[in-house]
């Protein structure tokens, strides 16, 4: 969490160095939060410190290094391949998600405010794999579900736009949804990168070659990444609460 705070501070410094563009994009984003171009611009202007960290984490991982070297892109052809995969595969779930929301990979906004080519690719990669993450954790495209995805992205990347998007979305939430935020932060922490010996291994999402799982069972992706889908986590929490309540009643 301290690292994420450091990256947020770095984002503030980056925004200050590009203040006119940042203020213009931020203002337009507030008035029109579905304006992908301005939201993307804010994300890029505040990203430099986090992007450096993301690149280093990729360089220290075998899969991450391969991704940086080959620089795969998520395109409409990727979606076409996924749509041909049978039910039960990650690709089938991804294709269904994209079809339901009428999304196409080629519709992603290209990176325009990151000068370094490698860092620009890291940012583009994060942007293009966003819908893979939606599919992996089982979230749709409501404001509340988008917040859940952004929280996980923030814990894995430190990109300030993740936390800024969460803060900016709070006024649109109901009281119950606001109360749920504590659970969502807990879930994101449970699914944060983890390489501690004897615990569930969770790689940085930047080091996951999502495309390689399109023709594989969805459960294999979950097993290899160690990520717990949000609905599974909430069911587990509900079960533990019910068990604790039952034990309390029995103890009376």
Curated annotation (Swiss-Prot):
Transmembrane segments: none annotated. Zn(2+) binds at residues 130-131, 134, 146. It is found in: Mitochondrion inner membrane. GO terms for biological process: ubiquinone biosynthetic process. Its EC number is 4.1.1.130. InterPro entries: Coq4 (IPR007715), Coq4_euk (IPR027540). The keyword Zinc applies. Belongs to the COQ4 family. This protein may be expected to contain an N-terminal transit peptide but none has been predicted. This is Ubiquinone biosynthesis protein COQ4 homolog 2, mitochondrial. The lineage of its organism: Eukaryota, Discoba, Euglenozoa, Kinetoplastea, Metakinetoplastina.
């Amino acid at each position: 969490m301290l690292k994420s705070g450091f990256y947020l501070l770095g984002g503030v410094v980056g925004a200050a160095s590009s203040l006119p563009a940042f203020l213009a994009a931020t203002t337009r984003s507030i008035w029109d939060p579905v304006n992908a171009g301005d939201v993307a611009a804010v994300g890029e202007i505040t990203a430099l410190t986090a992007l450096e960290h993301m690149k280093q984490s990729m360089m220290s991982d075998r899969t991450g290094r391969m991704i940086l070297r080959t620089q795969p892109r998520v395109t409409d052809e990727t979606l076409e391949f996924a749509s041909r995969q049978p039910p039960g595969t990650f690709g089938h779930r991804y294709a269904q998600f994209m079809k339901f929301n009428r999304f196409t990979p080629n519709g992603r906004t290209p990176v325009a405010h990151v000068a370094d080519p490698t860092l620009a690719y890291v940012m583009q990669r994060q942007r293009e794999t966003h819908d893979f993450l939606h599919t992996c954790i089982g979230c749709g495209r409501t404001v509340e579900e988008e917040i859940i995805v952004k929280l996980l992205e923030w814990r894995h990347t430190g990109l300030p736009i993740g936390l800024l998007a969460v803060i900016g979305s709070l006024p649109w939430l109901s009281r119950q949804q606001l109360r749920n935020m504590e659970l969502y932060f807990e879930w994101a922490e449970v699914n944060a990168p983890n390489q501690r010996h004897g615990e569930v291994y969770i790689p940085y999402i930047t080091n996951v070659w999502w495309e390689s799982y399109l023709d594989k069972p969805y459960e294999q992706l979950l097993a290899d990444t160690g990520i717990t889908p949000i609905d599974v986590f909430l069911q587990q929490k509900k079960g533990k609460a019910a068990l604790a309540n039952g034990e309390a009643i029995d103890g009376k």
